[in-house]
Amino acid sequence: MSKKLTKKQIEQLSQFTVDELLGVIHDLSEKYGEINQYLAMNYLMSPEEKLKNIENEYKRQFRKKGNYEYWKSHAFFLDLENKTVRSLDSLALGLPLETVKITEKMIGEADDLFEKYDTSSGSWQDYLYGLLNVWIKALGAAYKKDNQVDFVGHYLEVKSNCDYYFPSDLLQNNKAFVPREVIQKI
């Protein structure tokens, strides 16, 4: 069985009525639980509901016992990145202040998380660097939306809290989201 729909199959789907498509979606969601989550997260929730869902998922993952087995730890960080960081990335421009708040909390708790898991695979770095990129994107959007946001203060605080892990090229890689005057101040 192929993983992608062929052109012919897509053409057949385009000929379905709205009711037939709703029936297909309903059947799929009854048989496969992941489809329910995907539909809800990507199409049926407001941005505020998505943010709350992401925050709850992060709390659930953070409370897990921890594991020092290589592959389980590797899978944990990949899963955490997929379920939280990528979802936050889609909200960073729409809800910047809220995204900054939750990402700063997650960055602040990163060391506690790293102590509970084997970090030799390096997937923790993908998680953290993805999180830092979402944070800087949201912080830049919050600054552009409201110049009263203390971009430099937030930046220096997070940098000092995770200086060991902080990538030196973070601002350079996210120039599109960071105002020029802020880069000059830093």
Kindly label every feature range from the protein language model.
Residues M1-E11, E30, E34-I186:
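Eukaryote-biased, non-catalytic alpha-solenoid scaffold regions
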Residues V18-L28:
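Long, hydrophobic or amphipathic alpha-helical segments
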